[in-house]
Amino acid sequence: MKAGIHPEFKKATVKCACGNEFETGSVKEEVRVEICSECHPFYTGRQKFASADGRVDRFNKKYGLK
């Protein structure tokens, strides 16, 4: 590897939308995320249902199909 061409790797604070914060390594000092291991349904065991329907579901609702 060439010297002097790689970005500086430092401690970074990761901030989640749920309020959870933890430290990791990154080239940025602060990283913001929408979902972390504290609020993701896979890790919490709680299922969140998305309110946004897909295009097919909207079509079926609009025209009264299944």
UniProtKB/Swiss-Prot annotation:
Going by the UniProt record, its keywords in alphabetical order are: Metal-binding, Ribonucleoprotein, Ribosomal protein, RNA-binding, rRNA-binding, Zinc
Keyword rRNA-binding listed: yes
- NCBIfam families under this entry? L31 (TIGR00105), PRK00019.1 (NF000612), PRK00528.1 (NF001809)
InterPro entries per record: Ribosomal_bL28/bL31-like_sf, Ribosomal_bL31, Ribosomal_bL31_A, Ribosomal_bL31_sf
- Which cofactors does it use? Zn(2+)
Assembly? Part of the 50S ribosomal subunit.
Q: Name one GO cellular component term.
A: ribosome
Residues given in the record as Zn(2+) binding sites: 16, 18, 36, 39
Q: What does this protein do?
A: Binds the 23S rRNA.
Q: What is the lineage of its organism?
A: Bacteria, Bacillati, Bacillota, Bacilli, Bacillales
Q: Which organism is it from?
A: Bacillus licheniformis (strain ATCC 14580 / DSM 13 / JCM 2505 / CCUG 7422 / NBRC 12200 / NCIMB 9375 / NCTC 10341 / NRRL NRS-1264 / Gibson 46)
GO molecular function terms attached to this record: metal ion binding; rRNA binding; structural constituent of ribosome
Provide the protein name.
Large ribosomal subunit protein bL31
The free-text note explaining how the cofactor binds reads: Binds 1 zinc ion per subunit.
- Biological processes annotated in GO: translation
Pfam families from the xrefs? Ribosomal_L31
Identify its protein family.
Belongs to the bacterial ribosomal protein bL31 family. Type A subfamily.
Q: Which domain of life is it from?
A: Bacteria
